Amino acid sequence: QISEYKPEWLMLQPSSADLLCNYIIEHNIDIPDSVRYIEFSGELLTDRVRRLTKDVFRCSIANQYGTNEVETIAYECPHGAMHIMNSNVYVEIVDDIGRNVSGTGEGNIVVTSKTNKVMPFIRYKIGDKGCLNVHKCDCGNKAPILELTSARPSDFVITKGGDKVSPYIFVSIFNVINNTLDGTIKQFYVEQSDIDKFK
């Protein structure tokens, strides 16, 4: 589909990009040169996946860090630093009992939403670990830099053949169904009861 549609911009989860790039390499698929920019979000982006994606697509790459609850927390600048979106969230690094970690020490990332007036998230622990760096960045952005050190692992659907498939495949399936049902499905839940059975 990428070859047919010829997109200029892709938004991917690192785990999905890893699977996609390896599939492209294994099947010797030609990637159109229309892809000029790839944005990552949703998971911890490792150096390996970044290099792999850049080698396969040969385009600019940026990383966005956020959650469904508070949206964007930090965004990568051209110099590779993840600057906190101060207008959207307040970020703290705390220990396991909620005390602020001093300096650039590692701890649990907690966020407070500055924009959600209906259901505010205050010191929301998102399950990731990191540290704050306040050194001056050459890009000119004065916002603190968030360094993510560990993140929650992503779930995969394991097929009978042992392949790993992103669970977001179900989102695509239900989007197709909803297009024919005029958006009747508002929520869905999928459970893998056996290696080849879903309900």
Describe every region a protein language model picked out.
Residues 1-199:
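Active-site glycine/GP-rich loop and adjacent strand/helix microenvironment
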